[in-house]
């Protein structure tokens, strides 16, 4: 191992820990070593924090002895402002009302508190001026643009040491604009005529953006023919009016304000503080158009009459995106609905224009108008119950010629349970949801009917005989149904028990676990409606599905199929024979055995 090797140990929570510690020290007077007195009010503080946050306190503590506590009397600061300043220095933020904001900022300026005084802005401005002075005119894009424009109509030069006072002038001598502030800075003087003035204006705009960023200019307002950038700072202003004609223009970077006026003749002054005001006119129309496009992106320039909809990259925000055309996206629900309607009746659907009016799991009921299922209904049932189709596809009773009669009886019984209502979907949406999710709710004994059953002749024109109740009664009266099948079908009053007493708000009970559904005939509570329906069918209606191989009965068809596949594998194998037979023959033998067992169980 190299003895010169070193490990860097870093604490990621160092800054946050210091901030929390300073906040705790502000709340308590622990380890305080300096006393601040303001109009008789005493504040205890720490020299280290005061010196770190205030240049004036740092200079004061360097010149005072360090033995014992020291007392500092502040005459020009009120107790409220001092308390707010201490909170700002210890926590980094403070809430000040609008009325006390001016006096608070003056106190911070006198104590040179970092983050509140303009000393930071002055230092940033000086560094920017030194950087601009070190660069040659051709090193920056502004300098190259100035030289290019000066070749067409004028010349410009950089003169350090100028005094920038807020002076501005218009082309006609009638417009005037006052700037804020005075101070030593950078002066750009040039013989400007036409393009030369535009170059000076471009240089002024570049300097303005740099100084505005350092001075934290936040308030912007615009007017026709002029853009005003305003801030809060103290300074000295002035006004100047220039005459028309070609002459020399001066650009000065001065104190705490920015004021600029432009024409073919007149000085333009830029300040380095937080306030700014510049009037654009004459040959500075391009810069004015860019500013107007920033303030009004959808409009055009008000003075030049030229439409300018493109936002320059320098004025674009961070999250700017160019406008794009809206793309038309077709909903997948409409395509699915159209495909489903074509499968049903070969025409487009006009019953449900959107998935909001009709859920995707909706299955139209055609029991009141037709006794034979359509192809779309058969496909829908196979998709909804893949497990049931696994057993039914190999059954002779469903693949024989009387399969349509079996399906019609299933639909009759199911429609009877739904009270034979064609508009049941509008009355109770939960009935539809349970119909789509409850795979195998129909009685298995209907499927295991006699193989020699033939469908009844179509009814007459009498509409009353097409209802499920009437059809079922006619089948029983004609003796078409076998005795065991007719006995297995529950009476109409028992089949209608659920629809006769539909669930309403009175059936729900609020418990500690939430809202529960209460059975209409007993005190059992269920969290889901499907479980309550199964309970009513099993306990109160007596509808149960028997196993064809044993004595057990079940509530749902899926449960019977899983039970047969799990418990009666050997019976299915014995029924198929000792020799190896194809899979469809074994399934047919198992279905025949199940039908025989069901018939024996239902015989009196």
UniProtKB/Swiss-Prot annotation:
List all Acidic residues biased stretches.
425-437
Q: What domain of life does the native source organism fall in?
A: Eukaryota
Q: What is this protein called?
A: Zinc finger protein chinmo
Where are zinc fingers of the kind C2H2-type found along the chain? 517-540, 545-568
Role according to the record? Required for morphological differentiation of postmitotic neurons during postembryonic brain development. Ensures production of appropriate neuron subtypes within a lineage by preventing precocious generation of late neuronal types of that lineage. Acts as a downstream mediator of the transcriptional activator Stat92e and is required for the development of the eye-antennal disk which gives rise to the adult eye, antenna and head capsule, for transcriptional repression of the Notch receptor ligand Ser and for the self-renewal of cyst stem cells in the testis.
Q: Write one Gene Ontology MF term.
A: zinc ion binding
Tissue specificity remark: Broadly expressed in the developing larval central nervous system (at protein level). Expressed in the larval lymph gland and circulating hemocytes (at protein level). Expressed in all cell types of the adult testis stem cell niche but not detected in somatic cells of the adult ovary (at protein level). In the testis, expressed at high levels in cyst stem cells and early cyst cells and, at lower levels, in germline stem cells (at protein level).
User: Where are the membrane-spanning stretches?
Assistant: none
What changes when the gene is disrupted?
Answer: Inappropriate morphogenesis of larval mushroom body neurons with early-born neurons adopting the fate of late-born neurons from the same lineage. Malformed eyes and head capsules due to defects in eye progenitor cells. RNAi-mediated knockdown in adult cyst stem cells and early cyst cells results in the appearance of cells resembling ovarian follicle cells throughout the testis. RNAi-mediated knockdown in adult cyst stem cells results in loss of expression of the male-specific isoform of transcription factor dsx and leads to male sterility.
Question: Which residues fall in a compositionally biased region of kind Polar residues?
Answer: 384-409
Subcellular location, record wording: Nucleus
Region annotation Disordered: where it falls in the sequence: 122-155, 291-310, 330-437, 450-470
List keywords of the entry alphabetically: Developmental protein, Differentiation, Metal-binding, Neurogenesis, Nucleus, Repeat, Sexual differentiation, Zinc, Zinc-finger
Q: Listed GO cellular component terms?
A: nucleus
Record the organism: Drosophila melanogaster (Fruit fly)
InterPro entries per UniProt: BTB/POZ_dom (IPR000210), Dros_DevTransReg (IPR051095), SKP1/BTB/POZ_sf (IPR011333), Znf_C2H2_sf (IPR036236), Znf_C2H2_type (IPR013087)
Domain BTB residue range list: 32-98
Provide ranges: composition bias, Low complexity: 364-374, 461-470
Q: Name one GO biological process term.
A: neuron development
Q: What is the effect of changing residue 88 to I?
A: In chinmo-M33; mushroom body neuroblast clones contain increased numbers of late-born alpha/beta type neurons and fewer early-born gamma type neurons
């Amino acid at each position: 191992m190299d003895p010169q090797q070193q490990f860097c140990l870093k604490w990621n929570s160092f800054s946050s820990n210091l901030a929390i510690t300073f906040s705790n020290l502000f709340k308590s007077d622990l380890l305080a070593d300096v006393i601040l007195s303001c109009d008789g009010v005493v504040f205890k503080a720490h020299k280290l924090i005061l010196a770190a946050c205030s240049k004036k306190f740092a200079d004061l503590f360097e010149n005072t002895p360090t033995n014992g506590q020291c007392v500092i009397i502040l005459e020009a600061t009120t107790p409220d402002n001092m308390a707010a300043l201490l909170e700002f220095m210890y926590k980094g933020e403070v809430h000040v009302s609008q009325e006390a904001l001016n006096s608070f900022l003056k106190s911070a300026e006198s104590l040179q508190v970092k983050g509140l005084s303009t000393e930071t802005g002055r230092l940033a401005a000086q560094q920017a001026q030194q950087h601009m002075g070190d660069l040659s005119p051709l090193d920056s894009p502004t300098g190259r643009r100035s030289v290019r424009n000066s070749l067409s109509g004028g010349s410009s030069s950089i003169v350090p040491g100028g005094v920038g006072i807020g002076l501005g002038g218009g082309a006609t001598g009638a417009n005037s604009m006052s700037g804020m502030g005075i101070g030593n800075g950078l002066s750009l003087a040039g013989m400007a005529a036409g393009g030369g003035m535009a170059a000076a204006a471009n240089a002024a705009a570049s300097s303005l953006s740099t100084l505005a960023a350092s001075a934290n200019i936040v308030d912007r307002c615009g007017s026709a023919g002029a853009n005003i950038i305003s801030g809060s700072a103290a300074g000295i202003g002035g006004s100047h009016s220039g005459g028309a004609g070609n002459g020399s223009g001066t650009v000065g970077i001065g104190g705490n304000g920015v004021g600029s006026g432009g024409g073919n003749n007149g000085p333009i002054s830029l300040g380095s503080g937080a306030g700014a005001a510049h009037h654009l006119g004459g040959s500075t129309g391009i810069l004015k158009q860019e500013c107007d496009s920033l303030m009004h992106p959808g409009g055009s320039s008000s003075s030049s009459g030229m439409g300018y909809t493109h936002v320059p990259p320098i004025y674009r925000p961070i999250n700017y995106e160019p406008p794009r055309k809206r793309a038309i996206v077709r909903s997948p629900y409409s395509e699915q609905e159209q495909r489903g309607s074509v499968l049903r009746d070969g025409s487009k659907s006009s019953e449900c224009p959107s998935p909001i009016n009709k859920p995707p799991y909706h299955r139209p009921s055609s029991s009141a108008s037709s006794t034979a299922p359509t192809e779309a209904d058969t496909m829908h049932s196979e998709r909804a119950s893949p497990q049931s189709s696994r057993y039914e596809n190999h059954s002779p009773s469903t693949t024989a010629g009387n399969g349509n009669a079996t399906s019609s009886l299933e639909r009759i019984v199911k429609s009877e349970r739904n009270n034979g209502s064609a508009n049941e979907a509008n009355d109770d949406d939960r009935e539809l949801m349970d119909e789509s999710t409850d795979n195998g709710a129909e009685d298995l004994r209907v499927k295991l009917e006699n193989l020699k059953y033939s469908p009844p002749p179509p009814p007459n024109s009498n509409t009353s005989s097409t209802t499920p109740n009437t059809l079922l009664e006619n089948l029983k009266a004609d003796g078409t149904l076998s005795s065991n099948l007719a006995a297995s079908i529950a009476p109409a009053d028992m089949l209608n028990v659920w629809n006769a007493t539909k669930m309403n708000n009175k059936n729900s009970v609020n418990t500690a676990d939430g809202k529960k559904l209460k059975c209409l005939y007993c005190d059992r509570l269920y969290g889901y409606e499907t479980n309550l329906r199964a309970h009513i069918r099993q306990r109160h209606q007596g509808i149960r599905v028997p196993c064809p191989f044993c004595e057990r009965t079940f509530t749902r068809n899926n449960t019977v199929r899983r039970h047969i596949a799990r418990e009666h594998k050997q019976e299915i194998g014995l029924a198929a024979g000792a020799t190896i037979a194809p899979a469809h023959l074994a399934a047919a033998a198992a279905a025949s055995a199940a039908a025989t067992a069901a018939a024996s169980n239902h015989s009196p």
